[in-house]
Amino acid sequence: MNLSDYIRKRNGVPLGASNSLRNMMIRSLGAGKFSKFWKYWNPIWSYYLGKYIFKPLKIILPPALSLLITFAFCGFIHDLVIMIIRWDFALLLTPWFLLMGFCVIIGDYAKIDYSKFTWPIRASINILIISGCLLIAYQIQI
């Protein structure tokens, strides 16, 4: 699947469509599982992470470990940009993304599904998970 097809599948609209950001926000925040949130969030970034990080890792490692490494890599790339701009070493987003990766794995393992709730409740649950992971990451930032 190429990038354009991937984005159309995730957002329901073609790459560059005027309502793609809106669709991404509605679909990701309204996801009934935290793992589904990540299926819709930032499809361009997730396409390349999946193709060049997750899938190659999954060949040699268990899927859960591959997912955690992919989340940590994504967080580290975000941290790296901040470190270059600030010219100072700090890791906040790496542990944040790693914690969110753990939430994806735990949620899928425990079969946590809140898709029967209304969109505002689903969005609140997803925002709560993301915010909770960020608060914990602030406590352990390096």
Task: Kindly label every feature range from the protein language model.
Residues 1-74, 120-142:
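Membrane-interfacial catalytic/cofactor-binding modules of polytopic membrane enzymes
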Residues 82-118:
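Extended hydrophobic/aromatic segments used for targeting, binding, or gating
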